[in-house]
């Protein structure tokens, strides 16, 4: 399951999936949400709203991707590069949006990308 969920990993809408915060808690048929730990424990998010980081852009994994055989989850990260951020002004430190109202800002998105690394 992946997308802009419009909620953080620990919000009620996401908790209905039953996804676990830690890999060791995942049983057969469960989901694992690595972004929960990324936001809550590491303080890293994908969008900044009123000075607070949120992590709406999530990739939730099935237990099959945590097995020892075949393609499996290795790690995740929020893709953070200097050019993705507003460099000055009121919104300094926020992701550099494409536009703000009618003003073209020549940015990328108001959200940072998320990446899941898989290995054989």
Predicted feature descriptions by range:
Residues 6-120:
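Metal-dependent phosphoester-hydrolase catalytic domains
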